[in-house]
Amino acid sequence: MKIKTAEFVISNSKVDHCPNSTLPEYAFIGRSNVGKSSLINMLTGRKSLAKTSAKPGKTQLINHFLINNNWHLVDLPGYGYAQVSKSTKKVFQKFITAYFKKREQMICAFVLIDSRHKPQPIDMEFMQWLGEHNIPFCIIFTKADKLKPKILDKNIENYKNEMLESWVEMPEYFITSATSKLGQDDILDYIEGINNSI
């Protein structure tokens, strides 16, 4: 898939205010500072479609982007160590879970994992929650360019082993680098394949 157009549509904190559309949606979510904004900009070929920040927890709203006029890319708030108050975190969690439970247009969630780190409990718990609620998801390993190939392979293998303790099989996953554009075609082709089948 080639991205010809990518337009910001709306930001909001309530699922009921999301676009009144039947277009398929693909949600991107992960721990704070996982490289989500950089990945979205890489996928769309736009340098500043999603705002990047060195400060974790910058994305605090549900952001919809219209891609090629036929699907929505949804940028969700990061979870984890976002530098926000506990009460704000609860609000995040509430509308994130509401989005996944209520938004029928949501076809697949892409859970971003920093490939440099060992499996994190918060990531495992979130994916477990998705599974328990029958929400389709894939894993995107980010920042692959920061590691030597052998270490990258080892880290991903660790994740596979961890996942297979609770899951029958490893979910679909992609290895990416916003710097080298590694994984760009694979993810976009995956989305295109789903769009063509629905």
UniProtKB/Swiss-Prot annotation:
Residues reported to bind GTP: 30-37, 57-61, 75-78, 142-145, 175-178
PROSITE patterns in the cross-refs: G_ENGB
A Gene Ontology biological process term: division septum assembly
Keywords per UniProt: Cell cycle, Cell division, GTP-binding, Magnesium, Metal-binding, Nucleotide-binding, Septation
Domain EngB-type G: 22-197
Protein residues bound to Mg(2+): 37, 59
Gene3D superfamilies membership: P-loop containing nucleotide triphosphate hydrolases
One GO MF term: GTP binding
Superkingdom of this protein's organism: Bacteria
Protein family per UniProt: Belongs to the TRAFAC class TrmE-Era-EngA-EngB-Septin-like GTPase superfamily. EngB GTPase family.
Protein name according to UniProt: Probable GTP-binding protein EngB
Species in which this protein is naturally found: Christiangramia forsetii (strain DSM 17595 / CGMCC 1.15422 / KT0803) (Gramella forsetii)
Gene name per UniProt: engB
